[in-house]
């Protein structure tokens, strides 16, 4: 499945790895994991990672981005990971590269790279990179293995979401052969300061329901300023405080930012991706996102989700 990707890696002396902006564990994990796999198995190659600040995933060993000049893209291979659309790629200079490759597990919305491997059935992009390593018979680097395991954990919801398969656990077992402790992953991911627990309690108190049981939270700029929390912590970080509510199969978290209203859509049963796509976003069948211009547009999205919850097709 990955032979064309491996051929591209073998054919280039310099490789620059991209992922989506506002990175999550899967984006950082797949980027870091692939970087260190290539470095371990092709020691003569130059391998760099680029993008915005890894933020809360800075605990992942080796995740720091590199300083890469425009000239370094000449003759290089750019690999794009965990990006469902070109507008999501952090650092658009991938287009300067001689050759481009994309590995992704989001629903396909259009070609970005010269060579693409798109597999929505995978629980994570980290799972895809792990499968590539297994197919190639790579030497498994511990830094790479821990980074990839981290992304598998986060994007599978701790191996809970329905994209988790027997193959997922086989890949996880393969990574654990590198000898890291799962505590090295789970503790920095899920151990929280008291303030974060209190913040989550605050957002639980904000949950509202639509007529047909879509749970939602809306946080405006004034409240964001008052809370002093960053956009990622509130938008993606608080989306799943609405999961596991009896009778609720769709939930959405709206967060006002300088760039617009961040919309994090989730579902336990419905394919909410068409709603995200309708509003310029994308993602997975049961976990998608979009950024809309204002509250009025966000409420139209909420209305569409309410119709979906009542059985309508969007």
Locations of the language-model features?
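Short glycine-rich anion-binding loops that position phosphate/pyrophosphate groups of nucleotides
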Residues: 21-23, 83-86, 106-108, 221-223, ...
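Solvent-exposed alpha-helices and their adjacent loops that cap or buttress functional pockets
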Residues: 71-72, 93-95, 109-110, 140-142, ...
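Active-site cofactor/cluster-binding pocket
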Residues: 61-115
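Short alpha-helices
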Residues: 106-171
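Histidine-centered active-site/metal-ligand motif
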Residues: 18-20, 26, 103-106, 284
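Short glycine/serine/threonine-rich phosphate/pyrophosphate-binding segments
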Residues: 26-31, 87-89
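Hydrophobic helix-and-loop "lid/oligomerization" segment in the mid-to-C-terminal part
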Residues: 2-18, 29-58, 71-75, 157-314
């Amino acid at each position: 499945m990955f032979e064309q990707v491996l051929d591209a890696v073998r054919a280039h002396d310099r490789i620059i790895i991209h992922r989506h902006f506002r990175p999550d564990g899967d984006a950082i994990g797949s980027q870091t994991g692939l970087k260190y796999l290539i470095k371990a198995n092709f020691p003569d190659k130059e391998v760099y990672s680029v993008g915005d600040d890894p933020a809360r995933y800075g605990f992942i060993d080796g995740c720091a981005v590199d300083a890469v000049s425009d000239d370094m893209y000449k003759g290089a291979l750019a690999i794009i990971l965990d990006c469902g659309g070109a507008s999501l790629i952090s650092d658009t200079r991938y287009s300067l590269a001689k050759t481009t490759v994309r590995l992704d597990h989001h629903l396909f919305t259009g070609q970005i790279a010269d060579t693409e491997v798109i597999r929505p059935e995978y629980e994570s992009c980290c799972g895809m990179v792990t499968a590539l390593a297994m197919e190639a018979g790579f030497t498994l680097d511990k830094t790479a293995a821990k980074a990839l395991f981290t992304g598998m954990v986060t994007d599978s919801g701790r191996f809970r979401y329905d994209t988790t398969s027997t193959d997922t656990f086989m890949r996880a077992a393969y990574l654990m052969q590198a000898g890291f402790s799962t505590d090295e992953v789970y503790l920095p991911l899920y151990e929280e300061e008291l303030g974060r627990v209190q913040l989550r309690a605050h957002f639980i108190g904000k949950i509202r329901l639509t007529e047909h049981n879509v749970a939602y939270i809306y946080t405006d700029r004034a409240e964001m300023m008052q809370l002093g929390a960053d956009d990622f912590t509130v938008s993606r970080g608080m989306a799943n405080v609405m999961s596991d509510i009896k009778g609720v199969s769709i939930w959405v978290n709206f967060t006002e930012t300088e760039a617009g209203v961040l919309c994090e859509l989730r579902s336990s049963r419905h394919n909410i991706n068409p709603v995200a796509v309708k509003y310029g976003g994308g993602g997975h069948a049961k976990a998608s996102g979009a950024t809309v211009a204002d509250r009025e547009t966000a409420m139209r999205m909420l209305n569409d989700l309410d119709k979906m919850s009542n059985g309508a097709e969007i």
